[in-house]
Amino acid sequence: MNPADNILWGNIIKVHGVKGEVLVQVFSDDLTDYETLESVFVEIKQKQIPFFLSTFNFATQKRCILSFEDVTTVEQAKPLVGADIYIPVSKMAEADESRLSYQAIIGFEVMDTIQGKLGVISNFFQKTGQDLLMMDYQDAEILIPVTEEIVHSVDVKTKQVITTLPEGLIEIYLNEDASEPDAD
């Protein structure tokens, strides 16, 4: 399986119980769509390693308890804490595509309807007044307001965020970097 065909689904928060189970924070609104998963990919040393599931139990609306076939002790589970979990894009619930968390689209490419390919989403900020996506573009960090007029859609299969950025938005950030005084 090509890692590019997978999407970030969750993160292992901690070991749960004494049989090597793990508590997972899932970046999805409806876990019932995923209770039939047979396997997931756990990122270990920047590689996505397949883990087959023994059990999938609901903990809360956005958390589940997983047990893996070859992980049966706390000692085996501890090194997995903090690891990201990926699933194949093909396993992503259709309903979830419209409710993706910002965390899940980090690494997606920004495709603007006017300017074409721009950069990659590197972070997000959820603010009271305005959610923002951060895009890396020409060694600058561009903040993109998340509004219906600017961010049109997210294509999970191509890992693209489709936008129409306001005229001059990118230039504000590029000029800001160019106008910073040199430190002597």
Curated annotation (Swiss-Prot):
Q: Which Pfam families does this chain map to? A: PRC_RimM, RimM
What GO biological process term is on the record, naming one?
A: rRNA processing
The subcellular location is: Cytoplasm
SUPFAM superfamilies registered for this protein in UniProt? PRC-barrel domain, Translation proteins
Q: Does rRNA processing appear among the keywords? A: yes
Please state the protein's primary subcellular location: cytoplasm
Answer whether the UniProt record assigns the keyword Lipid metabolism to this protein: no
One GO cellular component assignment for this chain's record is: ribosome
Keywords, A to Z, come to:
Chaperone, Cytoplasm, Ribosome biogenesis, rRNA processing
Show the GO MF annotations. Answer: ribosome binding
Q: Which InterPro entries match?
A: PRC_barrel-like_sf (IPR011033), PRC_RimM (IPR056792), RimM (IPR011961), RimM_N (IPR002676), RimM_N_sf (IPR036976), Transl_B-barrel_sf (IPR009000)
Q: Which residues form the PRC barrel domain?
A: 97-173
Domain notes per entry: The PRC barrel domain binds ribosomal protein uS19.
Q: What does this protein do?
A: An accessory protein needed during the final step in the assembly of 30S ribosomal subunit, possibly for assembly of the head region. Essential for efficient processing of 16S rRNA. May be needed both before and after RbfA during the maturation of 16S rRNA. It has affinity for free ribosomal 30S subunits but not for 70S ribosomes.
Which family does this protein fall into?
Belongs to the RimM family.
Could you describe the subunit structure of this protein? Answer: Binds ribosomal protein uS19.
**Protein name as annotated:** Ribosome maturation factor RimM
Query: Gene name, please?
Result: rimM
